[in-house]
Curated annotation (Swiss-Prot):
It is an enzyme of class 5 (isomerase). It comes from Geobacter metallireducens (strain ATCC 53774 / DSM 7210 / GS-15). NCBIfam families: GroEL (TIGR02348), PRK00013.1 (NF000592), PRK12849.1 (NF009487), PRK12850.1 (NF009488), PRK12851.1 (NF009489). Keywords: ATP-binding, Chaperone, Cytoplasm, Isomerase, Nucleotide-binding. The keyword Cytoplasm applies. It catalyses: ATP + H2O + a folded polypeptide = ADP + phosphate + an unfolded polypeptide. InterPro entries: Chaperonin_Cpn60_CS (IPR018370), Cpn60/GroEL (IPR001844), Cpn60/GroEL/TCP-1 (IPR002423), GroEL-like_apical_dom_sf (IPR027409), GROEL-like_equatorial_sf (IPR027413), TCP-1-like_intermed_sf (IPR027410). This is Chaperonin GroEL. It is found in: Cytoplasm. Belongs to the chaperonin (HSP60) family. Its EC number is 5.6.1.7.
Length: 546
């Protein structure tokens, strides 16, 4: 297929046009007074959002060369969202500012490679300075403030996220779901929960709530199907003698084995319940091992040399309480030894570090949370489906940002941290051409605060000047249109977000500046429609048929 090639300034101008188109659509959402963007959907109602990365992901331009520029900036937003969960609009604004200034310098005859080196040195210095300014997050209140800012100043969301973090701890899993009601609420699960319910409703001990509750229960963990009653007999006899309830977790329990368990339960001989093992394949084996470690039992598996008919009572795990409903099983206060649990946690953490798959990482994180913290579910409520989608996206953003804040600490928000770190660039001494890159970063770092002010209907230059003349956390609160101590006012950004936004923006803008040729497919010529064939005349003669 034939290609079109653009060189030098012609190519860079096309990139700039694409960058500007995408960035101008995204940056209207920045800050507390940022505007909404409405996105048409092929199905259902349009999507209304104030999330930069959502806007960026929807943009495809008709011109292939301009689209390349837009797609590269989209990459900045996506990467920042993946790493830090927030800061996508800031990253887009920075990328546009760096590339716009840089392309002017290159057009004026400066060496793009030297400018890029200057940009890289400046960014390194700023990142080090941001880490110096950064303060560790101390309490519930600061976690709530980070969540509030990231959720576009929604204090309810900030409060719920802080509460969830407090309940399940740093390692805990917090998931976001759609609620059936109008209110947004938080549900937490103590202990280990997995999504498998009882195999028969006859196991229920509380008919009103339709759940089985076993106090001081023994737990049998088996990785194969149980269909033959003979295999289970030795364990059941010992359970009947001990008088304690028994939970059986196996790949499946069917036929004669299940029928016998139900009959014994109904006659009151045994207080028993059976559930299927969670997960599939290798993940199932790992989860059964987790349950065994948590409850101080052993997985009865032929792979490990244990047969079910030879299982002894000391292979069973124990827990203070087990609750089973039709969908979930929750094991509370397992009797596993602390040392074994910590060893297992260490092992899972090592796997999280090594894995390259996001899906695997998420599943490992869930397993870790079940062992150490617990699970919290934020149920997002709203009046309409459109509002629900928008709100759920905000909650997810806020959750990521809060985790980032707990990881690396916080800096003053509203673009102030960038202004405060500018002083570090004064001490940099580089060759003249590279110094242009440093000057360019100095100008670009003012852009987020300018845009926040502009979206609030205030002159950005005046705000930048006033903030530069202030000290420490002094900055512009666009929500109330006043100058305040940003940290005291709760306007804070996670350091990880500010750092990632700048690093990703500078990385992609630097690559675009050093581009000398662009190649794209030539648009296909659409063939013209063929003319109507002749010979269709003469139909009028049919009038004589009357």
């Amino acid at each position: 297929m034939a290609k079109i090639i653009k060189f030098d300034q012609e190519g860079r101008n096309a990139i700039l046009k694409g960058v500007n188109t995408l960035a101008d659509a995204v940056k209207v959402t920045l800050g507390p007074k940022g505007r909404n963007v409405i996105i048409e959907k092929s199905f259902g109602s349009p999507l209304i959002t104030k999330d930069g990365v959502t806007v960026a992901k929807e943009i495809e331009l008709e011109d292939k060369f301009e689209n390349m520029g837009a797609q590269l900036v989209k990459e900045v937003a996506s990467k920042t969202s993946d790493v830090a969960g927030d800061g996508t609009t800031t990253a887009t604004v920075l990328a546009q500012a760096i590339y716009r200034q840089g392309s002017k310098l290159v057009a004026a005859g400066h060496n793009p490679m030297e400018i890029k080196r200057g940009i890289d040195s400046a960014v390194e210095t700023i990142v080090a300075e941001l880490q110096k300014i950064s303060k560790p997050i101390k309490d519930h209140k600061e976690i709530a403030q980070v969540g509030t800012i990231s959720a576009n100043n929604d204090k309810t969301i900030g409060g719920i996220i802080a509460e969830a973090m407090e309940k399940v701890g740093k390692e805990g899993v917090i998931t976001v779901e759609e609620a059936k009601a109008m209110e947004t609420s938080l549900e937490t699960v103590e202990g280990m929960q997995f999504d498998r319910g009882y195999l028969s409703p006859y196991f229920v001990t509380d008919p009103e709530r339709m759940e089985a509750s076993l106090e001081n229960a023994n737990i049998l963990i088996h990785d194969k199907k149980i269909s033959n009653m003979k295999d289970l007999l030795p364990i059941l006899e010992q359970t009947a003698k001990s008088g304690r309830p028994l939970l059986i977790i196996a790949e499946d329990i069917e036929g004669e084995a299940l029928a016998t368990l139900v009959v014994n339960k109904l006659r009151g001989v045994l207080n028993i319940c059976a559930v299927k093992a969670p997960g599939f394949g290798d993940r199932r084996k790992a989860m059964l091992e987790d349950i065994a470690v948590l409850t101080g039992g052993k997985v009865i598996s032929e792979e490990l040399g244990f047969k079910l008919e030879n299982a002894t009572f000391d292979m069973l795990g124990t827990a203070k309480r087990v609750t089973i409903d039709k969908d979930n099983t929750t094991i509370i206060d397992g009797d596993g030894s602390e040392a074994d649990i910590q060893g297992r946690v260490k092992q899972i953490r090592a796997q999280i570090e090594e894995t390259s798959s996001d899906y695997d990482r998420e599943k490992l994180q869930e397993r870790l949370a079940k062992l150490v913290g617990g699970v919290a579910v934020i149920k997002v409520g709203a009046a309409t489906e459109t509002e629900m989608k928008e709100k759920k996206a905000r909650v997810e953003d806020a959750l990521h940002a809060t985790r980032a804040a707990v990881d690396e600490g916080i800096v003053p928000g509203g673009g102030v941290a960038y202004i405060r770190s500018l002083g570090a660039l004064e001490g940099i001494s580089l060759p003249a051409e590279q110094q242009f890159g440093v000057t360019l970063i100095k100008r670009a770092l003012e852009e987020p605060i300018r845009q926040i002010a502009q979206n609030a209907g205030v002159d950005g230059s005046i705000v930048v000047d006033k903030v530069k003349n202030g000290k420490d956390a002094f900055g512009f609160n666009a929500a109330d249109d006043e100058y305040v101590d940003m940290i005291a006012a709760g306007i804070i950004d996670p350091t990880k977000v500010s750092r990632s936004a700048l690093q990703n923006a500078a990385s992609v803008a630097g690559l675009m500046l050093t581009t000398e040729a662009m190649i794209a497919d030539k648009p296909k010529e659409e063939a013209a429609m063929p003319a109507m064939p002749g010979g269709m005349g003469g139909m009028g003669g049919m009038g004589g048929m009357m």
